[in-house]
Amino acid sequence: MPEISIITTFYDAVDYLPLTVKAILDSTFTDFELLLIDDGGPNDCGKICDILAETDPRIRVFHKKNGGPASAANVGLKNARGRYIATVDSDDIIEPTMLETLYRQIQESGCPMAACAGDCIDGQGNPLPGYNPVVCSLTGKIDALELFRDAFSTGSFYGPLSWNKLIDIRLFRDRGILYDEKMFYGDDASVLHRVFEGQTIYCTNQFLYHYRSRQGSMTALTFNPRKLDDLTMYYDWVQFFAARPQYAEIYRLGLKRFWQVYYLFYHQAVQAGKMADCHQAFAPHFEHLKELSRPLLAQCGLSIGEKLRLRLFLFNPALAYKLARLRGNLSK
């Protein structure tokens, strides 16, 4: 059996998938299988993968009806034969040494997981200026849940992402964890806190993963109501840490981040002219914001001005936003 299973799901990446597959096959670590999951895409990606599979026995192709990224990733989880799993998005590029580096860090540290840094490239593979790299303020061997301290305090998604990690597959299977198929965005991040609990991870800021941002891709769109999945994810994280007093500081940071992300999405929806379309989608998250408002106001060290804005927002979001516009303080 292979030591590592690499899961790559795809729907509409015909221009980039061959480059992604080539980068994986060029890895210096060779004891792996590559699972290509065709999520019922509209173009020839599935046929391309079948052709690629004929050129390298390490490639296994799975075709399925379209069900979203989480359902495709779960096909990979269920069929992986390796001791460790890695995920590579269908339009991204990994360094040849990524698998070797993360595997070595796991073996040397005794951690069941390892993670690296990532940066953003454009459609031609060139570095994109102005995009914050995915790095971590914590390095070396750490409590894996401490990655959420970094995520909540810096905004970096180094911790909650799957694509920059190599993970012992038993952390999924022994706990019965699968990706959340109700989530369109953040399907991997929405479950990793459960994978991390009670575990350690070795973190490095070596840039071994290159994330592609292209016009029209899910993550490049200015605002999409499906992004509100992130608020569900943040709420679940807050509830998770609320039940674990030993992580009280991370809980408080998570509360504050939930409010910041909610307000940011509200701002983006208004700026994109999508608020009328998104009003209904915001409703359950507004209820969560009201539910969390008491500890937010009491425990998170908000300034007097921020407390006033939160109280006004809870009373009348549109009015609070209009006042913020008059003051020139919209997105913070």
Which role does the model predict for each range below?
Residues 271-332:
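Membrane-interface aromatic/basic loop that binds lipid-linked glycans or pyrophosphate carriers
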Residues 1-23:
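N-proximal low-complexity "stem/linker" segments adjacent to membrane-targeting elements
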